[in-house]
Amino acid sequence: MSTDAPPADGDDTFWRERRTCFLTTFRPDGTPHLVPVGVTYDPETRIARVISDGASRKVRNIRAAHDAGAEARVAVGQAEGRRWCTLEGTAVVKDDPASVADAERRYTERYKTPRVNPNRVVIEITITRAMGTAKPSGW
């Protein structure tokens, strides 16, 4: 499918409704680390965001991949009944105030205002693949 123009039948609402998602990162030894998270997704930029404490295992896994000179490959997914979607891509950790504030705003729109965390960072995932029965527009 062309990635230039989103089809009209994408299921963007599935990524706006409140639900628990899961993020998979990989430890330095290659084993998967799967955790429940809140995810926001922007179909126009194809970027998913997860807010997190900067000392969390998921953040350390992503930073370790970059420190080793590799891309940090990750996946986020969610399901409800027979509807499901997994988004795969590459992740970076951002800690600059503008990126964190933007991610917090997006999180608040989908979930609720996050608790105060002075160590908060945002994991930004550039999506390279979408699969499932409720894929967002463009896939």
Segments predicted by a language model, with ranges:
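Charged, gly/pro-rich active-site loop segments
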Residues: 2-5, 81-139
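Short beta-strand segments
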Residues: 18-54, 73-77, 86-87
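Short helix-to-loop capping/linker segments positioned immediately adjacent to catalytic or ligand/cofactor-binding
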Residues: 10, 22-26, 110-115
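Active-site histidine-anchored catalytic micro-motif
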Residues: 69
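Short, basic/aromatic recognition patches
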Residues: 1-22
